[in-house]
Amino acid sequence: MEEQDARVPALEPFRVEQAPPVIYYVPDFISKEEEEYLLRQVFNAPKPKWTQLSGRKLQNWGGLPHPRGMVPERLPPWLQRYVDKVSNLSLFGGLPANHVLVNQYLPGEGIMPHEDGPLYYPTVSTISLGSHTVLDFYEPRRPEDDDPTEQPRPPPRPTTSLLLEPRSLLVLRGPAYTRLLHGIAAARVDALDAASSPPNAAACPSARPGACLVRGTRVSLTIRRVPRVLRAGLLLGK
């Protein structure tokens, strides 16, 4: 997806300048009341719905993405409402989102730099609930970075970092999605640089230069589209 094709007209007022293309950041995408409602629904989910990973735990809604295709599952009404709200922004080639990954991060937890991969339409949208976080972007590793004959290289530094406040919507498209890695450092406090602010600082009331932001428990709703969908019978070879 080229940068020009990745633009979303309805979101252009929220485009993050001075950042890799194409990133949109929408503050207060949902209300405080909606945030509280969604958090109640997430934490009221049955225990078997949770999967514990190293550094976070998650819920998977809509089906399990698979290279052969995803057998779709109906989204619960409390999620479908917000999937529709995001889909109405025309992020997924005119088609609706059909998958939601719910992540819970406790203070001090994060996720290693990664790419979302080819199972998804090349756009990711994330609603943040409960607490802020800082999302870091990295250039992909080069083959020579893994050369055992070379001296060990220091950990990569982010090319840019965004502050994500509660109730915000983040959308990644184009090179920001297809080329760069993104991750969240395992930290309890985010110390903002006193000399430079995140590129989306103008939309973040808490982004004061030199501020130390203490993380709380954060829940993210990652809303995407899985293009390849199968009926159960096809997956079973029937």
Swiss-Prot record:
Q: Which domain of life is it from?
A: Eukaryota
Q: Where does Fe cation bind?
A: 114, 116, 182
Cofactors demanded by this protein:
Fe(2+)
Annotated cofactor note: Binds 1 Fe(2+) ion per subunit.
- Entry's SUPFAM superfamilies? Clavaminate synthase-like
Q: Could you tell me which residue ranges the Fe2OG dioxygenase domain spans?
A: 96-227
Q: What class of enzyme is it?
A: oxidoreductase
Q: Where in the cell is it found?
A: Cytoplasm; Nucleus
- What Gene3D superfamilies does the record point to? Alpha-ketoglutarate-dependent dioxygenase AlkB-like
- Assembly and partners? Interacts with VCPKMT.
Family under the similarity heading: Belongs to the alkB family.
| Protein's recorded name | Probable RNA/DNA demethylase ALKBH6
